[in-house]
A protein has these predicted regions:
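Conserved catalytic cysteine-centered active-site region
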Residues: 38, 133-161
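Catalytic phosphate/nucleotide-handling subdomain of diverse soluble enzymes
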Residues: 162-179, 191
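Condensing-enzyme catalytic core mediating Claisen C-C bond formation in acyl metabolism
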Residues: 16-91, 95, 99, 181, ...
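Active-site-proximal alpha-helical scaffold in enzymes
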Residues: 3, 30-35, 154-170
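Glycine-rich phosphate-binding loops at beta-strand->alpha-helix junctions
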Residues: 115-134, 149-151, 155
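Acidic, glycine-rich active-site loops and adjacent beta-strand->loop/helix elements
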Residues: 4-9, 50-52, 148-150, 180-185
Length: 199
């Protein structure tokens, strides 16, 4: 089982009108199981994972209790809240996700247009549209739910997967590309085909 959960309401400054409206609290879980060897072309087809600490200052919560312990002075200064260089994160996300999607698609051998659905971390509609545009794909290939939930951080992909299954956008034999990205800066993309026996 893979679980993604974040309570962003605890780390986003409610007085920050640029950031507060973008985030939501959310949780989701995905149950994984082994694919039998005789089920060719099912399961995980390709993946890419990475991180680049040079961008660690672009998305931070300075007084998170690890490197900088919580203090009264820090709380008074608002250092318990997330700080983000939105423009730099935007540029990084579009470039990096597009590169990693291309890499995963290449390694999988599945043509880009043959993928049934793309589920990206629901960070920002402009980022999703920028990535979609750079890949030359139609809007219908992408699931977007951040208009209803906001950016739920690590909850966004499990929530989107659940929504896609319930809506019939993913079914037995569907090929789905998933890509997450965020603080650190870190990212992960994978391409999988649903088991024909999945329900």
């Amino acid at each position: 089982m893979v679980i993604g959960v974040d309570t962003n309401s605890r780390v986003v400054d409610p007085n920050d009108i640029k950031t507060w409206p973008l985030f939501g609290d959310g949780a989701g879980a995905v149950l994984l199981e082994r694919v039998e060897e005789n089920q060719q072309n099912a399961g995980l087809l390709a993946w890419s994972l990475g991180s680049d600490g040079r961008g660690s200052n672009l998305l931070v919560c300075p007084m998170s209790g690890t490197r900088q312990p919580v203090t009264v002075e820090g709380v008074t200064a608002g250092e318990q809240y997330m700080q983000m260089d939105g423009r730099a994160v935007f540029k990084w996300a579009i470039r990096l996700v597009e590169e990693n999607v291309q890499q995963v698609v290449h390694h999988s051998g599945v043509p880009m247009e043959s993928n049934d659905l793309f589920i990206l971390h629901q960070a920002n509609l402009r980022i999703i549209d920028g990535i979609r545009s750079s890949l030359g794909l139609d809007e219908e290939k992408f699931l977007v739910n951040l208009d209803r939930y906001g950016n739920t951080s690590s909850g966004s992909i499990p929530l989107a997967l659940d929504e896609a299954w319930r809506a019939g956008r993913i079914g037995p034999g569907s090929t789905v590309l998933i890509c997450g990205f965020g603080g650190g800066l870190a990212w992960g993309c994978l391409l999988y085909t649903s088991d024909a026996a999945d329900e």
